[in-house]
């Protein structure tokens, strides 16, 4: 049964958080969700500066396009952003915090009433050569961790969304990043 998901993305300019938000919305639509929105948060961001985006997916029509304030999923593309309180602000009890890091969820010592999933998306993307202008693009890889943790969309729907989003020459490498990150994702569920 499909559930409502309100997802907030945190990354740095150039990592692809906004693109990831849009790809997830497309995959959810292909999965059969009736309501999908993806909204970037714009400010004075520049390459390397903190950025955020929001995705809403629902079996019903979504009429809201504002930023997500009380997410049930927070995705962090750069683990160094965890030092900022607003990253986990509003994360609902029992929700998911998904972090791109080499560390196991228990090692993050975050406390909180939420589940944690971690994966070294940076390592996966570096090994595959998903690097542009010196920045490792972890946006597609972290989608593998999202799928593993939430099961909100299937790998098949994500593959279709990737094929619609990227040119043929970029599809295979991005699908490999998603699949590899899915496999290495470590999960610590709230007890």
For the regions a language model picked out, list residue spans one by one.
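Active-site cofactor/cluster-binding pocket
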Residues: 1-191
């Amino acid at each position: 049964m499909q559930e409502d998901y309100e997802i907030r993305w945190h990354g740095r300019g150039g990592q692809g958080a906004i693109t990831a938000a849009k790809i997830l919305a497309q995959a959810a639509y292909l999965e059969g969700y009736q309501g999908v929105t993806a909204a970037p948060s714009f400010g004075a961001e520049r390459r390397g500066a903190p950025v955020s985006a929001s995705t809403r997916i629902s079996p019903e029509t979504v009429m809201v396009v504002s930023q997500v304030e009380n997410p049930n999923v927070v995705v962090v593309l750069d683990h160094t952003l965890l030092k900022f309180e607003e990253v986990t602000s509003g994360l609902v009890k029992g929700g998911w915090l998904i972090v791109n890091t080499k560390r196991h969820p228990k090692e993050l010592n975050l406390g909180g009433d939420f589940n944690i999933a971690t994966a070294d998306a940076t390592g996966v993307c570096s090994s595959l050569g998903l690097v542009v202008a010196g920045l490792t693009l972890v946006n597609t890889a972290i989608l593998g961790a999202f799928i593993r943790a939430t099961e909100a969309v299937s790998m098949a729907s994500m593959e279709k969304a990737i094929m619609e989003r990227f040119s043929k020459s970029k599809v295979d490498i991005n699908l490999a990043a998603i699949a590899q990150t899915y496999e290495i994702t470590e999960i610590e569920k709230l007890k």
